[in-house]
From Swiss-Prot:
GO BP, one annotated term: snRNA 3'-end processing
Modified residues (Phosphoserine): S338, S809
Subunit structure: Component of the Integrator complex, composed of core subunits INTS1, INTS2, INTS3, INTS4, INTS5, INTS6, INTS7, INTS8, INTS9/RC74, INTS10, INTS11/CPSF3L, INTS12, INTS13, INTS14 and INTS15. The core complex associates with protein phosphatase 2A subunits PPP2CA and PPP2R1A, to form the Integrator-PP2A (INTAC) complex. Interacts with NABP2.
Family matches, as InterPro entries: ARM-like, ARM-type_fold, INTS7, INTS7_C, INTS7_HB, INTS7_N
GO CC annotation terms, alphabetical: chromosome; cytoplasm; INTAC complex; integrator complex; nuclear body; nucleus
Keywords: Chromosome, Cytoplasm, DNA damage, Nucleus, Phosphoprotein
Subcellular location: Nucleus; Chromosome; Cytoplasm
Keyword Disulfide bond included in the entry's annotation: no
Signal peptide residue numbers: none
Transferase keyword on record: no
Primary localization class, coarse: nucleus
Superkingdom classification of source: Eukaryota
Protein name: Integrator complex subunit 7
Length: 962
């Protein structure tokens, strides 16, 4: 079973080399473990983590760890050390060990060795296993005993194990706390050992009493041992304990501020700042105004730039949270106090022009956060200070290529974007500063500044026209070399130009871009610029760039991919010629667009591979094709009112049938079909949305907008023609347009609002169906198609990758072979799964739980038909499980009372942290053959045999009577 399930799990893994199935790979490693050469044994041991990564199901992992435990038991210390490292690297797979008792028994046998190094490695091994054996009393006893050892290596290992078990087990933490306390306070304990014992106290957070006793001990240590190392370790442990227990966080903040203010040692001050930063990130709501005020006073008084930088970093973190609002809300309640006169603002204003770049960056960050957060206050002076500080920082850092200067520049540019969004009236001066500085900046800084300009232009498109001229002039003079930075700058600047140009690019701008690309750019740069053009709706530019790339690729898959993009861009370009009130021209434009779309989907299908099936891209384009066809069909239906008006007897037919719509003739039925078609398309867009778990938010919003377009047209058909009396417009408001994140979304929302206003004005005004109604529908279609389609990032690039692999037990040796089960028994189906991630797990969303749906259908009956309750004929079950360390498992009991072959389907979907369900798959199928149990079969045969003589006697009697 394990072999087959794991083999199917790896069937689609493309590692580029000849892969073995799980059993073969394990046998290869087992052969190495049995080798007489130490080098081969070590090589086999260290290859186990890769085996676990490729075959992450419990049966193989259990077998592998048992083999490693045998090596640990009989091998030398070097092999034991290798096994320990493998165990620590494979921590997420430890819960998949099925025979925990046997595994621990083999490991634990080494604890009785006379070799202290062997005992030390065993203790570290037990500590690494604390997550699966937190309450093993023999392990607890061995750790306590080893803490009293005279061998330093063994004692250090015991300290490591004690820390791990304290984090996992409340009983162990309660039992070991007093012993740790005695050892720390004991005179015989060396100082180095005390420094290693103190961090164990950070895990004493399982209950309030334990945490309180640990805090008291740490308080005594800080007072009794004033040496620098002891104070640093004790304070940091103090902070971690407070952050975990949450109860004593305000006291800990006060203690750290006290040491920051009064202790003269810079090392202690640095530690206090580091811990304050940790608490500011984790619990900003626990900071009082007095805490922030004390930190400001320390920063104002300190003469050391390094300490001032650290304190400002803490204040910058707090300024972006609720703490700063609390600070100013209390300050404004004091007589004669205002935000402009507070120490926090005074400190930030002083630091904005500091000669240290880091201090200046944090100063403007604090000012920006205050300006954006406290919008209800009159902060004109602070706004100007923030803008001037950002300008000076921009001038300073844009001329420097060093990593420190670029990091500071990123902070300043982020503040500019935040300021432009929070205070739109400041955006014009921010943009002018960026454009002025763009000409003289270094290439590295230019790239970052272009990203900033693009972000501001996306939020405030009204600024785009003003910056376009400067950007085009700059584009003419850059790109004199083919360095990576120059290529990156070409892409960044082209992106800003696409964002800034609200409509189609002018011929002059296109000529400038193409001229630069022809001179110094490589193919990858051209592709990235074309990709941005497709994203921003500049399809004519994108088509020309894709055309130039077709002959520059070596793979046919890449050729077909680029060709499909060229055809899609050409198809969208055809729709730019649409004009309102010109419906025949609209039909020809849509037909022309569909022609290129069909060419493109053929190329896109040819570009897909088993490892990269391009499923999202294909489905998105198919939906676009179907949507265009539905639009075309609806325009033809509207035109049919002229070409095929209602017959003269239509009113009589309507009265006879009792359906008032029949007086409109055949158009009423066609409109009903169109409405159902658009609702079906909206449902398919919804399915695509749910299947795109790894997509970025902009792509998902794009899919959502396409779905809303379909719903809008179906609603318009219903409100104008099919059911104008019951049409409601309350749920369709103009909310959301102000919060649009892109120009495409902004334009689509504007079209939606305009169409809804037109439909509402016509609703109940004219009796359906009139030419006014059909014209309104056709104009709505043209308005939607005139907004250039945006191909978002997920169409080109997958930043997050998440997949689920399922293994079913029992599973047949051959996938087509059914599993035999008796009809009077239930099948226990075990479903195991592994969540696999790419290089950036959880970038957009994470899996909170996995929903497993199991259903069975009868494929073919065998034997006689019996009357069986309907409940026994089908199985339909659902369970939710939460993955732990990317692994989950559950079981289902299935009933197969009807004899025959049943098809079992297991389908998985996931729920993210926001409670949204995503249909990610996969879908797995196995077959079960339900057989009659022997006892029932025997009874049935006996009954048949008993009935045979009776039937023969009845036949003789019948012959006799005859």
């Amino acid at each position: 079973m394990a072999s087959n399930s794991t083999k199917s799990f790896l069937a689609d893994a493309g590692y580029g080399e000849q892969e073995l199935d799980a059993n073969s790979a394990l046998m290869e490693l087992d052969k190495g473990l049995r080798s007489g050469k130490l080098g081969e044994q070590c090589e086999a041991v260290v290859r186990f983590p890769r085996l676990f990564q490729k075959y992450p199901f419990p049966i193989l992992i259990n077998s592998a760890f048992l083999k490693l435990a045998d090596v640990f038991r009989v091998g030398n210390n070097f092999l034991r050390l290798c096994v320990l490292k493998v165990t620590q690297q494979s921590e997420k797979h430890l819960e998949k060990i099925l025979n925990v008792d046997e595994f621990v028994k083999r490991i634990f046998s080494v604890i009785h060795s006379n070799d202290p190094v062997a005992r030390a490695i065993t203790l570290r091994m037990l500590g690494s296993l604390a997550s699966i054996i937190p309450e093993r009393k023999n392990a607890h006893h061995s750790i306590r005993q080893s803490l009293d050892s005279h061998d330093n290596v063994e004692v250090e290992a015991a300290v490591f194990a004690a820390a791990n078990f304290s984090a996992q087990s409340k009983d162990f933490a309660v039992g070991i706390c007093n012993k740790i306390s005695e050892m720390i306070q004991g005179l015989a304990t060396p100082v180095d050992l005390k420094l290693k014992l103190i961090p164990i106290l950070q895990h004493m957070h399982h209950d309030a009493i334990l945490a309180s006793s640990a805090r008291q001990l740490l308080q005594q240590l800080v007072t009794a041992y004033p040496s620098t190392r002891m104070v640093i370790v004790s304070l940091h442990t103090f902070t971690l304990l407070a952050a975990s227990s949450l109860v004593d966080t305000p006291k800990q903040i006060q203690l750290l501020l006290q040491y920051l203010k009064n202790d003269p040692r810079k090392a202690v001050k640095r530690l206090a700042i580091q811990d304050l930063k940790l608490l500011a990130n984790k619990t900003p709501h626990t900071w009082s105004r007095e805490n922030i005020q004390a930190l400001c006073e320390c920063a104002l008084q300190t003469p050391y730039d390094s300490l001032k930088l650290g304190m400002l970093s803490v204040l910058a973190t707090l300024s972006g949270t609720i703490a700063v609002k609390h600070y100013f809300s209390i300050a404004s309640g004091n007589v004669g106090s205002s935000p402009r006169s507070s120490d926090l603002v005074k400190l930030a204003q002083e630091c904005c022009y500091h000669n240290n770049r880091g201090i200046a960056a944090h100063g403007v960050r604090v000012l920006t956060n205050i300006t954006v957060s406290c919008q209800e206050k009159d902060l004109l002076a602070l706004e100007q200070d923030a803008v001037f500080g950002l300008e000076s920082l921009l001038v300073l850092c844009s001329q420097d290529d060093s990593p420190g200067a670029q990091a500071t520049l990123k902070i300043a540019l982020n503040c500019m974007v935040k300021l432009a969004k929070g205070r739109p009236h400041l955006s014009q001066s921010v943009v002018e500063t960026l454009l002025t500085q763009l000409h003289s900046a270094q290439d590295t800084a230019r790239i970052l500044m272009c990203h900033c300009l693009a972000a501001i232009a996306m939020q405030l498109p009204v600024l785009g026209d003003g910056m376009l001229g400067d950007l085009v002039e700059l584009y003419k003079v850059i790109g004199r070399s083919a360095t990576d930075k120059q290529q990156e700058l070409l892409v960044s600047l082209a992106t800003v130009i696409f964002v800034a140009s609200q409509k189609a690019l002018s011929a002059e701008v296109k000529a400038v871009i193409k001229q630069q690309l022809e001179s110094v750019s490589n193919g990858w740069t051209v592709y990235r610029i074309a990709r941005q053009a497709s994203r921003m709706g500049n399809h004519d530019m994108a088509r020309e760039l894709y055309q130039t790339l077709l002959t520059q690729v070596a793979s046919e898959h890449f050729y077909f991919w680029l060709n499909s993009l060229k055809e899609f861009s050409h198809a969208e370009q055809c729709l730019t010629g649409l004009q309102e009130e010109n419906y025949s021209s609209a039909l020809s434009c849509i037909a022309e667009s569909l022609k290129f779309y069909h060419k493109g989907i053929a190329s896109l299908t040819a570009a897909s591979t088993p490892l990269n099936p391009l499923s999202f891209q294909c489905e998105f384009v198919k939906l676009r094709i179907d949507l265009l066809q539905a639009f075309s069909q609806l325009i033809c239906t509207c035109n049919s009112l002229k070409t095929s008006p209602p017959p003269a007897i239509a009113t009589t037919i309507a009265m006879t049938l009792g359906n008032d719509l029949q007086r409109c003739g055949r158009i009423s039925n066609q409109m009903k079909l169109s409405m159902e078609e658009f609702r079906s398309l909206a449902s398919r867009y919804g399915d695509l949305y749910q299947a795109s778990f790894d997509a970025d938010s902009a792509t998902l919003r794009n899919v959502e907008l396409q779905q809303q377009s379909c719903l809008l047209i179906s609603h318009a058909i219903e409100a104008l023609i099919l059911d104008p009396e019951s049409a409601s417009f309350q749920e369709y408001g103009s909310t959301g347009a102000a919060h649009a994140d892109s120009e495409y979304e902004r334009r689509m929302m504007s079209v939606y609002n305009h169409v809804l206003e037109e439909v509402e004005s016509l609703n109940r005004k004219y009796t359906p169906v009139s030419y006014m109604h059909t014209a309104c529908l056709c104009n709505a279609i043209i308005s939607l198609l005139k907004v250039p389609l945006s191909f978002q990032r997920y169409f080109f690039q997958k930043l997050q990758s998440t997949s689920i692999k399922l293994a079913l037990s029992p599973s047949p040796r051959n996938p087509a072979e059914p599993i035999a089960v008796q009809n009077n028994q239930q099948l226990a189906l075990k479903v195991e799964g592994v969540v696999q991630h790419g290089s950036k797990p959880g970038l957009f969303r994470r899996i909170q739980s996995v929903c497993l749906n199991v259903s069975s259908t009868l494929q073919s009956k065998s034997g006689q038909d019996y009357k069986i309750p309907i409940d026994n004929m089908t199985n339909e079950m659902e369970q939710r499980v939460e993955p732990h360390n990317d692994y989950f498992s559950t079981q289902f009991l299935l009933n197969f009372a009807i004899l025959g072959t049943h098809n079992i389907t297991v389908e998985s979907s996931v729920k993210d942290a926001n409670g949204i369900v995503w249909k990610t798959g996969p879908r797995t199928t196995i077959f079960v053959k339900s057989l009659e149990d022997p006892y029932s079969q025997q009874i049935r045969l006996q009954q048949q045999q008993a009935q045979q003589p009776l039937q023969q006697q009845q036949q003789r009697n019948a012959y006799t009577r005859f």
